[in-house]
UniProtKB/Swiss-Prot annotation:
GO terms for cellular component: bacterial nucleoid; peptidoglycan-based cell wall. It holds the Pfam family SMC_N. ATP binds at G29, E30, T31, G32, T33, G34, K35, T36. It comes from the Bacteria. The gene is recN. This is DNA repair protein RecN. Belongs to the RecN family. The lineage of its organism: Bacteria, Bacillati, Actinomycetota, Actinomycetes, Mycobacteriales.
Length: 587
């Protein structure tokens, strides 16, 4: 429920604060005082596009701030609203209320705030649109649109779950159809790609490269290319360390020399020399190890150049792969892994195509059944809704009016991308909201031809149709009880007894909802629980909002009664109208 609204520098309103209660609140005022700015402010809180031209002349920005409570709402609605607050980081005030604010800058971007936290306008509307239902003359025009008519019928029918199930199946069906078409169109391309991948993997598997093999080959080839030089260097070094095989010269080797030196030092009684003997012994150990390693190195060296030729041939094989698939062998192996994964995804078999065709057919059947189920729900609800709206119109001084709702299957051409064959044999167009075309019909006098609402209702008649529809939706609990319903001059083009009946219907609606109405009709204003008047407060044309007392209400109603003003007859007429309305039992 909206408990307070503060407007600053919006249109004709300089600064105004209005407090709202449960029940029926009416706003009146002379033309040009800014009554509609109150509704405009609520539209802004509902996420409407910010218009800098709405900022009052001389001001830098306009601000609209609303305070909402959720105590009168059902648990499910409160839980949904709390989820919006939590996701936005918004907080409630100490009394549990929530402040929503919209700021419009003359030169910069607009700002939105919810519970003290800056939020996108979409997040703000996600909260306020659950609490506010706004209706104006533009909304009457929207009621002529087929999608709005279908939406109203679905609300009455409580068709939300059926619509969601249909949409889920439709998305799956469209995805499967796209996959099937893509599969058929790309079958040859996929087969060619699979052949290329198989050829490449076979080539790689035949060569059988090992991780890092190309790097190791470079080192091996470099070593084998200098085989004679390496053998000579190793042989010379070994001979120098251990001596030549000639027994007469064997004592010239480093091993023998170090052995003799160590023995000489060990034979001494001098401690220093014996310490040096240990160092020479360590050197001897190192030299002996080096001699052994040089021997092993020489044993491993190929006896001829055939080993080099084998390494070069292997390098040529690997280079064939690195020229085609990657810069090095490790990259080739990664490419092969990716190719195997891709090949596993490429199902080019006839079995795969047939399975996809079966799945698409199954989804089409399920979707067709869901569409029929949704149509059945709508057709049943259409009869009840049309009957109840016609009854409301009768109570609004339109006893001969007839309101109808047509629900027909929207047929499709064979070339339509969303054509769906139904069990009945019809080829329907599977739109986002079903296969149904919903059309509201209206005739002011029974016996005449019923025409589409857009072609048959005048402004005043359209106002009453819309009000009747809202009353039916609200009283059948398709609108959450405790929410706020705002009507901006939907009584345009209406007067007399019809205006009285509109007032009565709005008062009845206020039993379960907070109802706020901007009106120029005294018959409607007389039924309100609270009467607010928008009036000019200064010479600069600024306007404010004032709550009227009982006597003030009489004076305002007298003004609204054809400008009778402060005349005795005007006041008497206004007082009688007010007393009659307030004492109406609203049966």
């Amino acid at each position: 429920m909206l408990t307070e609204l503060r407007i600053e520098s919006l249109g004709a309103i300089s600064v105004a604060t209005a407090e709202f209660d449960r029940g029926f609140t009416v706003l009146t005022g002379e033309t040009g005082t800014g009554k509609t700015m109150v509704v405009t402010g609520l539209h802004l809180l509902g996420g409407a596009r910010a218009d800098a031209t709405r900022v009052r002349s001389g001001a830098d920005r306009a601000v609209v701030e609303g305070r909402f409570t959720t105590t009168d709402l059902d648990d499910a609605t409160v839980a949904g609203l709390q989820a919006v607050l939590d996701s936005s980081g918004a907080e409630r005030d100490e009394d549990g209320s929530v402040i929503a604010l919209r700021s419009i800058s003359r030169d910069g971007p607009s700002r939105a705030y919810l519970g003290g936290r800056g939020v996108p306008a979409k997040s703000l509307s996600g909260f306020t649109n659950e609490l506010l239902t706004l209706h104006g003359q533009n909304d009457q025009l929207r009621l002529m649109r087929p999608d709005e008519q279908r939406g109203a019928l679905d609300r009455f029918a409580a068709a939300g779950e059926a619509v969601q199930r249909y949409r889920k199946l439709r998305d799956a069906w469209l995805t499967a159809r796209r996959d099937l078409v893509d599969r058929r169109n790309r079958a040859r391309e996929l087969a060619q790609e699979a052949d290329r991948l198989k050829f490449a993997l076979n080539e790689i598997d035949t060569v059988d490269p090992q991780p890092g093999e190309d790097v190791a080959l470079v080192a091996d080839i470099a070593r084998l290319s200098e085989l004679d030089t390496l053998r000579e260097a190793a042989t010379t070094a070994r001979a120098t360390l251990c001596g030549t095989p000639d027994a007469d010269a064997f004592d010239r080797g480093a091993v023998d020399s170090l052995g003799r030196a160590r023995a000489a030092l060990q034979s001494s009684d001098d401690a220093a020399l014996r310490g040096l003997a240990e160092q020479v012994g360590e050197a001897l150990t190192v030299v002996v190890d080096a001699v052994a390693e040089l021997g092993a190195y020489l044993d491993e060296l190929p006896a001829d150049a055939s080993a080099l030729d084998a390494k070069l041939a292997r390098q040529a094989q690997l280079r064939t792969l690195t020229r085609k698939y990657a810069a090095d062998i490790d990259g080739v192996l990664r490419w092969a892994d990716e190719a195997r994964a891709r090949l596993a995804q490429l199902d080019v078999s006839e079995e795969g195509l047939a399975a996809l065709e079966r799945r698409t057919g199954e989804l089409a059947h399920e979707l067709g059944q869901a569409a029929v189920d949704l149509s059945t729900i709508r057709r049943k609800a259409a009869k009840r809704l049309a009957k109840e709206v016609s009854a409301e119109l009768s109570a609004l001084a339109m006893a001969d009016a007839e309101f109808t709702i047509g629900v027909t299957t929207e047929l499709a051409d064979h070339g339509d991308p969303v054509a769906l064959a139904l069990a009945s044999g019809e080829l329907a167009r599977a739109g986002a909201d079903g296969v149904d075309a919903v059309e509201f019909g209206f005739v002011a006098h029974r016996g005449m031809t019923v025409l589409p609402l857009a072609k048959s209702a005048s402004g005043g008649e359209l106002s009453r149709v819309m009000l009747s529809l809202e009353v039916v939706l609200a009283t059948s609990r398709k609108q959450a009880a405790g929410t706020t319903m705002v009507f901006d001059e939907i009584d345009a083009g209406v007067g007399g007894w019809a205006a009285v009946q509109i007032g009565r219907r709005l008062a009845r609606l206020a039993r379960t909802h907070q109802v706020i109405v901007v009106t120029h009709l005294p018959q409607v204003a007389a039924y309100a629980d609270v009467h607010l008047m928008v009036q000019r407060t200064g010479r600069d044309g600024a306007s404010g909002v004032r709550r009227l007392t009982s006597e003030d209400r009489v004076a305002e109603l007298a003004r609204m009664l054809a400008g009778l003003g402060d005349s005795d007859s005007g006041r008497a007429h206004a007082r009688e109208l007010l007393e009659t309305a307030q004492n109406d039992e609203l049966t």
